[in-house]
């Protein structure tokens, strides 16, 4: 048995709004299924061996998206601890996306032009923020800082569909349901999605 608590109604327990789970473990041979109650108080009977992580809710919807075939692009080659500039200059001219918010993208400029997963690579840019404001970088114009990651795409149309999905009510619900630690979006989650995860 596993009960997930959202933190919204539990302030009287710890005097702070914090998410937590509680569970009951029995000393018996392993069961194949576990009763899980999510943040929306919906009950599910799940084989937890089939999950690398559990969403806080929208479990059925997200289960249909799993499949380990979404290619995530992430490394820290353009970490902002490395030498960079806030403005484009003669030496610092390669644009690297550091932040993405409602106002658009925040750029840092670096000297080196890395082409492994950054420049020249078609991708949809996402950020480790709580909320997502996806950017279709099909032309591979941008590198990514330690706060930004990419979803590999093959066509501009595929990127447009991913952006459309993540901006939809369903996409926002999926993103909101997959917050664990400090409400940031974990790029590892996308690696567990199937190739058609964004198809509504």
How should each PLM-predicted stretch be described?
Residues 9-200:
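C-terminal substrate-recognition regions of SAM-dependent nucleic acid methyltransferases
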Residues 1-9:
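Conserved S-adenosyl-L-methionine
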